[in-house]
């Protein structure tokens, strides 16, 4: 038998993403979970809780929009895949996204439960459409702009 040729060295890219401090995750996750548990388990109704639900929804939507905007800015000039992670992801956990979407959902759940309406599916469908649009529209616009600059 002939001796095997030596293998070429393989270089692997170093993980340069920053780690999220543990104390931030230890504060964020129980807080968001508590808000969601309150929204899902409350049986009270009234205008005060509806307003609180709308405020939580607005905070979640704006937090998630900030996360989405930052992600698109970090990936400027690069197309972002719709069903996968972005090519440039400088952090392991994006706390804005980790708080934004659960708060958005919690606000929608609390608003629907506290309104005590006869047709909750109308509100639910509006909130679901808003959530889907909040996720997809900025990515579609970003990818169309990147495609235009690539073809020009």
Question: Predicted regions span which residues?
Answer:
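Cytosolic-side membrane-entry/anchor segment at the start of a transmembrane helix
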Residues: 1-28, 82, 86, 139-152
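Alpha-helical transmembrane segments and their immediate juxtamembrane interface regions
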Residues: 62, 124-152
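Select subsegments of transmembrane alpha-helices in polytopic membrane proteins
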Residues: 19-30, 89-103
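Loop-to-transmembrane helix junctions at the membrane interface
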Residues: 69-101
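Alpha-helical transmembrane segments
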Residues: 46-61, 126-130
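Alpha-helical transmembrane segments and their membrane-interface junctions
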Residues: 34-45, 98-131
């Amino acid at each position: 038998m002939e001796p095997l040729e030596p293998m070429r060295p393989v270089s692997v890219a170093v993980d340069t993403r920053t780690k999220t401090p543990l104390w931030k995750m230890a504060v964020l996750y129980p807080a968001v979970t508590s808000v969601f548990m309150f929204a899902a388990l409350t049986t009270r109704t009234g205008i005060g809780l509806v307003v609180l639900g709308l405020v939580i929804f607005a905070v979640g939507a704006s937090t998630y929009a900030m996360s989405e905007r930052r992600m698109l800015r970090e990936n400027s000039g690069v197309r972002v895949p719709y069903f996968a992670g972005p090519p440039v992801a400088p952090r392991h956990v994006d706390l804005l996204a980790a708080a934004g979407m659960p708060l958005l959902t919690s606000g929608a759940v609390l608003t629907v439960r506290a309104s005590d309406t006869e047709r909750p599916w109308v509100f639910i469908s509006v909130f679901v459409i808003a959530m889907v649009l909040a996720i997809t529209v900025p990515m579609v616009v970003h990818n169309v702009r990147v495609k235009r600059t690539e073809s020009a």
